[in-house]
């Protein structure tokens, strides 16, 4: 058995914008805040993607999706995750579990926790996903996610 651990982290600033939405784990969330990001700014999928890349020793998402590349403007983060999953598939690695923590102050995670979990299970095929939430004391105009992934293979 070959066991791999990957860790990922992402954060984005928020600015006030009435009747806006952010994406968390591929789920659109209505809010009065807007993410400042080049892609769709999904901190959950970005942290997960980096953790997946870590399991394969493939670097980080910035190596594959340059933030200065205009073709990545508004990019759906599911595209990023799917690219990372294809890299991992070459190593025949399979998920054991995904454990992540979302840090946010004004965006309430609890009402959408199970929707995020379900989305991640569907996107990754992993049936052991844990989503935790913590409030940010400061800065309040930021959202972040930390993610740890455990994978294994019998090669």
Swiss-Prot record:
GO terms for biological process: isopentenyl diphosphate biosynthetic process, methylerythritol 4-phosphate pathway; terpenoid biosynthetic process. Transmembrane segments: none annotated. 4-CDP-2-C-methyl-D-erythritol 2-phosphate binds at residues 10-12, 60-62, 65-69, 140. It catalyses: 4-CDP-2-C-methyl-D-erythritol 2-phosphate = 2-C-methyl-D-erythritol 2,4-cyclic diphosphate + CMP. It is an enzyme of class 4 (lyase). Pathway: Isoprenoid biosynthesis; isopentenyl diphosphate biosynthesis via DXP pathway; isopentenyl diphosphate from 1-deoxy-D-xylulose 5-phosphate: step 4/6. PROSITE patterns: ISPF. Its EC number is 4.6.1.12. One of its GO terms (molecular function) is 2-C-methyl-D-erythritol 2,4-cyclodiphosphate synthase activity. Disulfide bonds: none annotated. Homotrimer. Involved in the biosynthesis of isopentenyl diphosphate (IPP) and dimethylallyl diphosphate (DMAPP), two major building blocks of isoprenoid compounds. Catalyzes the conversion of 4-diphosphocytidyl-2-C-methyl-D-erythritol 2-phosphate (CDP-ME2P) to 2-C-methyl-D-erythritol 2,4-cyclodiphosphate (ME-CPP) with a corresponding release of cytidine 5-monophosphate (CMP). Belongs to the IspF family. This is 2-C-methyl-D-erythritol 2,4-cyclodiphosphate synthase. The lineage of its organism: Bacteria, Bacillati, Mycoplasmatota, Mycoplasmoidales, Mycoplasmoidaceae.
């Amino acid at each position: 058995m070959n066991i791999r651990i990957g860790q990922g982290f992402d954060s984005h600033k928020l600015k006030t914008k009435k009747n806006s939405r952010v994406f968390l784990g591929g789920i659109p969330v209505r809010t009065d805040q807007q993410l400042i990001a080049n892609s769709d700014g999904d901190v959950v999928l970005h942290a997960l993607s980096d953790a997946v890349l870590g399991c394969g020793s493939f670097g980080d998402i910035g190596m594959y999706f340059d933030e200065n590349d205009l073709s990545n403007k508004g990019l759906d983060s599911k595209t990023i995750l799917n690219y990372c999953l294809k890299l991992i598939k070459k190593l025949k690695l399979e998920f054991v579990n995904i454990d992540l923590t979302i840090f946010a102050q004004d965006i309430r995670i609890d009402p959408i926790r199970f929707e995020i979990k379900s989305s991640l299970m569907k996107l990754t095929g992993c049936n052991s996903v844990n989503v935790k939430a913590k409030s940010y004391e400061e800065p309040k105009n930021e959202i972040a996610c930390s993610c740890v992934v455990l994978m294994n293979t019998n090669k």
